[in-house]
Amino acid sequence: MRKYPVLIIVIALLFVLPLLITGCQSSRDSINGKVVEADTINEDNNEQKEDNKEEMTEEEKKAEQEKKIAERAALEEQRKKELGDFYVPLLPLDDEREIEKVEAKGLYVTGNVAGMPVDKANVEMYAEYIKALYENNSSKINELKSKVDKLNKFEKILGIAVATEINTLVIDVKDDNGLMTYKSDIAIVDQVGANQNVRIKDIKGLMELFNEYDIYPIARIVTFKDKNFASNRTDHAIQLKSGGVWRDNKGVAWVNPYDKFVWNYNVAIAKEAVLNGFKEIQFDYIRFPDNAKKYNPITDFPGRDGRDKDEAIEDFLEYARQELESYKVNIAADVFGVITKSWDDEPEDIGQTWRKMAKSIDYMCPMIYPSHYSTGWYGYEVPDQHPYGVLSAALKEAIERNASLENPPVIRPWIQGFTASWVKGYIKYNPKEVRLQILAGKELGINEYLVWNASNVYDPLAYFPIEEENNVIAPDKRQDIEKDLIGRTPDSVMKDYLSAEKNKVYSKMYLLTPIDDRVFDYDEFRTSIESLNLKLVKFDVKDYKVIDQNNAEVKLSYEYSQQIDDKVLRVINEDDTWKLIKENGIWKVKRPDIKPMQVEEGQ
């Protein structure tokens, strides 16, 4: 009688074991990473959900929407508690915007000008007048001249956008005094009195106007030069060690760039600007005050915690990027023109280092105004007299710096749209001088630009191509594969690299080393080169061969020495070949291992 249970168990196992084996196999497949079936199931489930959604009744759809609204309301209440006086709502649930990329060609507009009344008929009339100017239609010019003289600045700017290549306007949101140009609903903005001088009465109406004229709006936020905030919340200003608030030569107090309270203030204003319709946030004065040597000994920056100034700016931009990510907006930063040449914030000491800032932004906007360069820059006695030359030289430096980054931002320079009559030997900046700056960028593949004129007076003829632009071919479209974006051949890059090594200009070596062949941190890179204890005695670059668009070889000879105690090791190579690759459009040197072997005693 006891045999039957055993028989039943055996029969059961015969049925169950295959199922167990199949289950184990499925588990093993999952463990081994074979998740295609699971992904397929998920996709099927998602498709099923979509099908079900389509099959939902109107009542069910309404219930689902009400649920989303309730969840969002709860989230916003939570955010209000967390953000407090810095609270700004998220994008509306029904806002399905995507980040818009535009090849921007833009003009700067103050809050005063952007707040001027607009008659669309006047805008169209000015556009017609511009066309007549361009075509040299004297009868139409004479017909409209007396009328257009009566138009306000903003109507003329909009007319320029209608009639020329201008498609972007940079509008002050928080101005150079720290005041809002339109009324903000952010609690902290009201508390510090930043709403006291509102000039744009209808920000939504302004955005509708931009949409109508297909204008890309950029919100300029003057970040750390904010005398209003610094004066009203002195505990968040740059402090004097002796007590009280530090002020610059013009008596202006600055906020402390290390202070996260200040970060939250500027980021909140940026968020609200997005909600109002701006498609890009441009942080200006994203730096410490200049003349650092004068104020460094007497000032204190609470919250510094041993960080360099450029770390504070780097950290702020990364924080802003994270906070603005869900707002679907581009981020730009304005930097001094000299940042294209200086390294690690030296000697300026204002917190601006190209590679550190570039990691967290979409657009880098160096302010390359020829009038702002002193005698000797780029070999010019009066740089202001050379709009093309200054732009070309500075942008080549910018391109080289950008190429050292894994995900570089777009370079979009600010150019000079004004006459710098205070400069000794200045020239008048007419349309040709403005256009020569644009030409310099085009020749280097940089088609974007922003024009600065503090008075907002722009000559429309500056925004039509000149004859020299007709034959410009962008570097990446040229047939000459030997040259990189800034016109260098492999042998010239090799000479630059070895000259930098010989003279211990490690920053240049950093820029000309492929990204995967070095660390990102420059100090670590420099230490790694110095630790080799190699001295380049001499070199001679003989010839080069371009293998394809992105690879080349250079033949060279060189001599290195290495001092170890009382011995000198040398390596002499009369016929070596080094490889170069083109990365982000720039030729870079793949450095081989150099191992000195020959020993010379007692040298």
Enumerate the predicted regions with their spans.
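Catalytic domains of carbohydrate-active enzymes, especially glycoside hydrolases
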Residues: 152-178, 275-280, 444-447
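Aromatic-lined carbohydrate-binding/catalytic grooves of carbohydrate-active enzymes
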Residues: 162-198, 290-299
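Aromatic-lined carbohydrate-recognition surfaces of secreted/lumenal glycan-active proteins
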Residues: 216-226, 282, 309-350, 406-418
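Substrate-binding cleft of secreted/luminal carbohydrate-active enzymes
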Residues: 361-375, 387-392, 397, 402-475
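Short, low-complexity N-terminal intrinsically disordered segments enriched in polar/charged residues
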Residues: 473-503
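Short solvent-exposed beta->alpha transition segments
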Residues: 491-492, 503-553, 562
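Exposed beta-sheet edge and beta->alpha loop/turn motif
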Residues: 547-603
